[in-house]
Amino acid sequence: MIITQMSQFYMAGLGLLFLINILPGTTGQVESRRQEPGDFVKQDIGGLSPKHAPDIPDDSTDNITIFTRILDRLLDGYDNRLRPGLGDAVTEVKTDIYVTSFGPVSDTDMEYTIDVFFRQTWHDERLKFDGPMKILPLNNLLASKIWTPDTFFHNGKKSVAHNMTTPNKLLRLVDNGTLLYTMRLTIHAECPMHLEDFPMDVHACPLKFGSYAYTTAEVVYSWTLGKNKSVEVAQDGSRLNQYDLLGHVVGTEIIRSSTGEYVVMTTHFHLKRKIGYFVIQTYLPCIMTVILSQVSFWLNRESVPARTVFGVTTVLTMTTLSISARNSLPKVAYATAMDWFMAVCYAFVFSALIEFATVNYFTKRSWAWEGKKVPEALEMKKKTPAVPTKKTSTTFNIVGTTYPINLAKDTEFSAISKGAAPSTSSTPTIIASPKTTCVQDIPTETKTYNSVSKVDKISRIIFPVLFAIFNLVYWATYVNRESAIKGMIRKQ
């Protein structure tokens, strides 16, 4: 019995020794499996480092670890629902804008498109830190974890924040708690237009932004570099085909509503329309149409078909031009400068047609008056007997002697030849030779052409002179107005 117990104790001891020899090898195998290439191991500093540590400098690894701890500490207990300085001071947000592209501008929708880098700077005491770097560049991921201004664009119809290939946002944190937040935006903003001077018009397209929820007692806005340098437009930033960007004016406004007073930052971009397109498409065709309508004054007044074609064609052409010129404009209730020009041109063209109608009317009346004499003369011819001879003699015979006579000069003989009746007396004073015949003026139904109408003669001078005077006054007025507007913008 004792021997059996000793043998069992001996076997248990051998088994224990065997297990002691096996376990260290097993532990080494497990650790070797964990340290495969590409795996990470814990370091004493508490960070993560690759197995191939010489590839990454130790100081860089230390900075990453340090700032990771700093950010974790800053965000620990940070409430992004509360603005900086809540209950103590007003939060000041400084802004500036860099315009990368401006345009296009839509006249029909009265809006414009602008692509900008929008920058905002503010101070947050909760984000102060001490570290090896004074400025910490960050990406957009931290922006969702901290408080940011609730800026919106008052006259923006649609705004797009670019997200390709990642959200185009930049966040920089300074050790004193100052933050710089930059984003790239494409904004479709409203631009009220007054088109009375179209197409020599100038517009001030505003860009207005401010806080949506915070009043002036909580958040105020200011320009980072002052009013002169806080808004900058790139040299090649204009995307305008019909406008020139003259400049911009920066300002600040206070608006009042039922919820309080709000600060609104404003920038007005001044645009001047290019007139070249409209000169080619509208003004020159109108001028040429008016000149063409005045060509009819130099045609014969009996050329009814030609002058009718001139008048009707030019009127229809002006109607077509006026309709096409309005297609590129919004349907405003007032007349523009182009409308006035086309209305005057239309009046000249229509007046030329009326002038022809007047001349043609009086021309037909004169033919009718001449035609009245023909039936009366034919009636007289039937009642008065005439000598059946075809030739009228230009001589007369007195006592056997023949003398030549000029009936056109001698009025007495002309009266005798026209008014004397055949006498039955046996002793006539004047004995006509066999060649003598009775002279009778009988009108014929022949159409005679009228001379140039006095109305046409006057119109050839009056119409061109009046049209030239109108053009001088029209262009002088709007060119001077354009210079005054440009001078006003430079002063601002």
Curated annotation (Swiss-Prot):
Name of the protein in its database record: Gamma-aminobutyric acid receptor subunit alpha-3
Job of this protein: Alpha subunit of the heteropentameric ligand-gated chloride channel gated by gamma-aminobutyric acid (GABA), a major inhibitory neurotransmitter in the brain. GABA-gated chloride channels, also named GABA(A) receptors (GABAAR), consist of five subunits arranged around a central pore and contain GABA active binding site(s) located at the alpha and beta subunit interface(s). When activated by GABA, GABAARs selectively allow the flow of chloride anions across the cell membrane down their electrochemical gradient.
Disulphide-bonded residues: 191-205
Reaction(s) catalysed (UniProt annotation): chloride(in) = chloride(out)
MF terms in GO: GABA-A receptor activity; GABA-gated chloride ion channel activity
Topological category with respect to the lipid bilayer: Multi-pass membrane protein
Assembly: Heteropentamer, formed by a combination of alpha (GABRA1-6), beta (GABRB1-3), gamma (GABRG1-3), delta (GABRD), epsilon (GABRE), rho (GABRR1-3), pi (GABRP) and theta (GABRQ) chains, each subunit exhibiting distinct physiological and pharmacological properties. Binds UBQLN1. Interacts with GPHN.
Binding residues annotated for 4-aminobutanoate, in chain numbering: 119, 182
Swiss-Prot/TrEMBL domain comment: GABAARs subunits share a common topological structure: a peptide sequence made up of a long extracellular N-terminal, four transmembrane domains, intracellular or cytoplasmic domain located between the third and the fourth transmembrane domains.
Cytoplasmic topological segments: 296-305, 358-457
Main location: membrane
Range of residues in the leader sequence: 1-28
Family statement drawn from the similarity comment of this UniProt entry: Belongs to the ligand-gated ion channel (TC 1.A.9) family. Gamma-aminobutyric acid receptor (TC 1.A.9.5) subfamily. GABRA3 sub-subfamily.
Residues carrying a glycan: 63, 163, 176, 228
One Gene Ontology CC term in the entry: postsynaptic membrane
Top-level taxon of origin: Eukaryota
